Amino acid sequence: MVKNKSKASIKTIYVTAYMIMFIFAVKIRLLVFHNIYYSLMCLIIAYCILGVIGIYLFRKEIRKGVAEWKEHFTNGIIWSIGAYITDMILSSLANYPSMALYPNYDGMNDISISSAAKLVSVPLFVTAAGILGPITEELIFRFILVDKLRTKLPSIICVILSSVLFMVWHMHALTLPELMINLPKLSTGIVYCVIILYSNNPTIPILLHVFNNTTAMLMMLMNGTI
């Protein structure tokens, strides 16, 4: 019992550290000092550190996912493909309001990613934003806010909370255009939450998130953006 409480406390500290990192390193530093380089470097370094720590803290859940792949590989593939297609469809639908109302608006999160790609080396950028960043976000928004929190709250509340926070997390301004352009994050969050709840494999959302981010970075490389 004491050991379980200790683990829960450590994971709570992990979530708190993530919140502090995002609010101070990204938001406050960017708004107060108006220095995007320092803000992005803090974010990249923090994602690398928190990603490694998170993998260690949630190693039991990750091992469970790996074991699930070994035992039910076909089932995992079906869930992954189904989730990917569903996410693409829902994200496209969620993107319509932004395209209709603000067709020329570029999301501040995308601008930040492009800026980061130009400021740091490609290997560091891919490691932080393509691999460890998604892992960290999945541990926070899906592992903790859904898989763990559903023991205390109804699953539907956990899904709504996780998905809304996941969307807000990617907003860099409290404006209607910024809200609209991040609606696809809300739909993606819902899809990933459903996977956590019903697939019995917690690593699927991680793999999909990493795949989506690294694919986007590959496109940026091919287009000469980074």
What are these regions (language model features)?
Residues K7-A25, W79-I85, V159-S163:
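Alpha-helical transmembrane segments
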Residues M21-V26, A46-G54, A83-A94, S162, ...:
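Alpha-helical transmembrane segments of multipass membrane proteins
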Residues M1-K7:
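Short, Lys/Arg-rich, polar N-terminal cytosolic tail immediately upstream
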Residues G54-T74, L145, I204:
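Cytoplasmic juxtamembrane interface segments
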